[in-house]
């Protein structure tokens, strides 16, 4: 393999046994791709797919006026350029968005001739702002970065389930079916305990299902025909003959003797008919058999029976045959009677019974009944009934199964091969009767069908033909087009009568004991709605509001001569979008503690949110791990607490397909031969295959070598022959998420602890000097690069300039496009605040002259080290008890760790002050504050704003501000002072911004925002000038490189050419050489007149190109200057806003929470002097002492293995360091490295590195050789021992330690080694808090709670019991009164303390008064009797 520029600096030794067949896909692809599909901004309007914004527009437009005389059509949309880039939006508190404009066409028809277009107006209309996604998959909303979390919701389609016997006391299973559309009414079918089948619409009152079947146009006869097989009886005067279908008799008890044609008895009466009997009946070829009359009595008539002579209906379908009816039938000379075939076992008479319970008789009556159920209390007019019913499931506007819903529906009804299409026919409503007749004749349709169609026009033209294949529908469309009908073929996304019937059929089959119910937690029944889809739904909701308003205004459009922009008001759209991105449950404040937390947040999948589950309603099953999660959703990473199992993370190789189902990657296997073909399968498809695990044994040719292979099939684990295997996992770690795959030796950790480990890595605070983990899993580089924290080269080239804040790269010629500037400038992020107040700082990794390729890491970010994720520090750890300081997971730490700033982190606090325009006059930001002394103002400049670099602590003034005070009555002394000095100092009060308590640090940045029209102060101007200076530097660098390239090209072009003349009196015919060119400024080279016309032309082109580049740079600079100098958008009433950023250094201290990567968390209990720490034989002290009891019960043994391997890594590093100090040759170093890298696990080709690179790499390995033990494919025990032996360490990983205080050896050997240990974001500085007198709650008058409110500590019920138990009555009294809510008492205490008297007078607690009032509000008179 080839190593990148960064990898060469430090190769990570991997213990993986299997070569990677598929690289980990880009980790943010789900978010970016989803939003890209939503916008489609890079696609030409005519080539856009019908999804995202395009789908939203096409589903609402065209909007037709009520009269039908005017319509507004959608043509296309375009997105403008965003006004500010991402960083500008973050600084100014703006939303990173671009304006959406839609081109719409207003078509006005002629009133006299409705088919004639009178006029057409086309115009671009502003449709609001659409927030844009940053390159890292987040959004900047009002200056803060947010993430839209994907939602896992129930897929549209049809689902069959039962109540698990919970509804009825008998434990009977009640089956139900539910049709869930993407949008529209839910349709439920359910059995009741008496086996009658009902339906509900939107969980309203239930009605017999036959009412719905009649409403969709079926008669009773048709209903019975659909759901039952028929038995045929032949009637004659004296006997009844039964037409035998032998199979139907199985399991029945014979009610008479079955005698064959030869008189042999086949089944005696009262005997159960078995399979043998049925074979005998078949062999005897009995077609008809005479049966007693009581065999027919009680059966149900299948079809209406009509007396042919009189035309009278003798029996209706679904009537029960009684003796009277039988006599009537004979009387009417009916010879054949068909009855329903039912039995107790597997052919229930459910539909028949339901039909009997149904009171409606006709289609119209059924529709009226449904109308009454949907709109109780409204009078059912014929038109209203039709509109409501057709709107329920047939209207495209109101009902949409969506593509995925239709796919799931068809799959469940076993119609996989037929995609259903429907023919939308519009433009018939205006045709006269005669025209419709012609149309009917030409198309071969009944006139009634076409008239039906016309009556359905108002609710989205209905289909003429449904559930047909594409070719059938297209053939019909071709017939209708010439007849003036507006024909459109589209997939059937509404329900059809056939759909409803088939759903009921399957439900009846389930009740009959055939078929299986659906598992709603199966990932084939749950789909992901990503950003794009969620945004599209919101946009559509906004458009629907616009549509209503446009419909109203369209009628005025023709009379008032309005333009499209007069009709459309973009506010509802903007409001819907703003509400979604700003306050939706799925739009979350981005977790930016470290790169991993950022990337995990974007890969999160939540079952909560609008249209999803709620915490309270979600049961155990939804939260549990399901077999289909394999490779799709991580079984480990989920929060602890009420959200467990509802919020998940995508697995490493998971991706979301076009339908929204999560897929995972598999290798194809053909007859036991594993290929390198990769296929992505969703949970639906995977159910049909046999899948082997990634660790299945393969021979040298890549064939499965075991006789039986462990596989998964239909959610079960089985052993299968190699020939049966169809797919194989791509990687052992494909079942876990990013965070879980960063845990080395995960396979040795208990799942509960692995969950904590995965979650706690996301809380790790970036350290001042990030350090790569000695023991990693090999995925650290992927995470660092994909998270966007590390800066990655966009194009290859040579590094031209480097400083702490920027890297300039001259791009390779073959990677530049003509007319493009061949310069990449990477402005690094310096000391910037993240959402969690941690510090984001990028450090360049390249030097001037380095050659880099596309994708190489140019600069490290927060928590990355040489392009690898580095969340913590490698610490020398000993597992032993130490004087109780590691009791209950406490952590004992050496003072050296603190002294070396190993866990020191920088946190940046943003403090804001605003100057408003008040009723009494404007507030002013100034240095002139009378009440402050010079010492307090010493850090402020002339504008009253703190200097950058000032060291500040709690209480210091950062920004001076005064607010006008209302005029008050002056005392005589003040009047005298004012008379003498004539000043008005007393009418302002000091409202300066001060450093809050608990913060002490350095001011690192100040930003001043001024409203348009208000004069900027000096400081604001200076900040703008500084910005412009930086921008100018960038442009100058670009220009310098462009010029250098241009001059190099010119030099190559004109050297050796003859000249006709030029500067410095160049004679005609002189050959130009280098000496001549070096003697003048390169800008004068363009004045040389060349003899060769072609070369002269090329020279002119280069000159023009340079001039154009200068012009472009001037325009860019001017644009930037204009942007910076224009006024800032500030909230109403705000004149000026100042933001001050203070960097706070947080050193490790007792009370801080720390953790390893295996869920081994604890709190620092004591920081011990180095000399007292336990030390090894050579005198080196350990850094951290952990409790050995924290391992066995927690079952996270991975930490022990990590410690052993970490020790080997460090030992090998020391050996390499010793070789370098001894100045060993590159060959010797290469030999030792080869021994380390190629003795086991994945081999590395060190021959690719030259000697200089080998020595540079060895220099980087001095601190330890980094190892990778991939999840489920990591280092074995023997390999760890081999590495320990190579490093010259004891293979047990245990050593004798000595007590630092006494110098004596501890009794037994102790496990010592290096572990990657993290400092978490739960810092004692943020939690420590003490209250003096502070705010009180308005109602109860008790002190508020919490640090943010400067609150008190709650003295709860149990604490009161404790004091009662001790009999400390006075302490208890003051706790419940003067220290809490006795208002008069606490004032009195204050007075007493001031007077020097130390006594209390407890009175009535305010909360008692609140209780009294509460009881009185319940109309109970309660009063206090005072004695």
Curated annotation (Swiss-Prot):
<protein>
    <recommendedName>
        <fullName>DNA-directed RNA polymerase subunit beta</fullName>
        <ecNumber>2.7.7.6</ecNumber>
    </recommendedName>
</protein>
<keyword id="KW-0548">Nucleotidyltransferase</keyword>
<dbReference type="InterPro" id="IPR015712">
    <property type="entry name" value="DNA-dir_RNA_pol_su2"/>
</dbReference>
<dbReference type="InterPro" id="IPR007121">
    <property type="entry name" value="RNA_pol_bsu_CS"/>
</dbReference>
<dbReference type="InterPro" id="IPR014724">
    <property type="entry name" value="RNA_pol_RPB2_OB-fold"/>
</dbReference>
<comment type="similarity">
    <text>Belongs to the RNA polymerase beta chain family.</text>
</comment>
<dbReference type="InterPro" id="IPR019462">
    <property type="entry name" value="DNA-dir_RNA_pol_bsu_external_1"/>
</dbReference>
<dbReference type="GO" id="GO:0003899">
    <property type="term" value="F:DNA-directed RNA polymerase activity"/>
</dbReference>
<dbReference type="InterPro" id="IPR042107">
    <property type="entry name" value="DNA-dir_RNA_pol_bsu_ext_1_sf"/>
</dbReference>
<dbReference type="InterPro" id="IPR010243">
    <property type="entry name" value="RNA_pol_bsu_bac"/>
</dbReference>
<dbReference type="GO" id="GO:0006351">
    <property type="term" value="P:DNA-templated transcription"/>
</dbReference>
<dbReference type="InterPro" id="IPR037033">
    <property type="entry name" value="DNA-dir_RNAP_su2_hyb_sf"/>
</dbReference>
<dbReference type="Pfam" id="PF10385">
    <property type="entry name" value="RNA_pol_Rpb2_45"/>
</dbReference>
<dbReference type="GO" id="GO:0000428">
    <property type="term" value="C:DNA-directed RNA polymerase complex"/>
</dbReference>
<comment type="function">
    <text>DNA-dependent RNA polymerase catalyzes the transcription of DNA into RNA using the four ribonucleoside triphosphates as substrates.</text>
</comment>
<dbReference type="InterPro" id="IPR007641">
    <property type="entry name" value="RNA_pol_Rpb2_7"/>
</dbReference>
<dbReference type="GO" id="GO:0032549">
    <property type="term" value="F:ribonucleoside binding"/>
</dbReference>
<dbReference type="InterPro" id="IPR007642">
    <property type="entry name" value="RNA_pol_Rpb2_2"/>
</dbReference>
<dbReference type="Pfam" id="PF00562">
    <property type="entry name" value="RNA_pol_Rpb2_6"/>
</dbReference>
<dbReference type="InterPro" id="IPR037034">
    <property type="entry name" value="RNA_pol_Rpb2_2_sf"/>
</dbReference>
<comment type="subunit">
    <text>The RNAP catalytic core consists of 2 alpha, 1 beta, 1 beta' and 1 omega subunit. When a sigma factor is associated with the core the holoenzyme is formed, which can initiate transcription.</text>
</comment>
<dbReference type="Pfam" id="PF04565">
    <property type="entry name" value="RNA_pol_Rpb2_3"/>
</dbReference>
<keyword id="KW-0804">Transcription</keyword>
<dbReference type="GO" id="GO:0003677">
    <property type="term" value="F:DNA binding"/>
</dbReference>
<dbReference type="InterPro" id="IPR007644">
    <property type="entry name" value="RNA_pol_bsu_protrusion"/>
</dbReference>
<dbReference type="InterPro" id="IPR007645">
    <property type="entry name" value="RNA_pol_Rpb2_3"/>
</dbReference>
<dbReference type="Pfam" id="PF04560">
    <property type="entry name" value="RNA_pol_Rpb2_7"/>
</dbReference>
<keyword id="KW-0240">DNA-directed RNA polymerase</keyword>
<keyword id="KW-0808">Transferase</keyword>
<dbReference type="Pfam" id="PF04561">
    <property type="entry name" value="RNA_pol_Rpb2_2"/>
</dbReference>
<dbReference type="Pfam" id="PF04563">
    <property type="entry name" value="RNA_pol_Rpb2_1"/>
</dbReference>
<dbReference type="InterPro" id="IPR007120">
    <property type="entry name" value="DNA-dir_RNAP_su2_dom"/>
</dbReference>
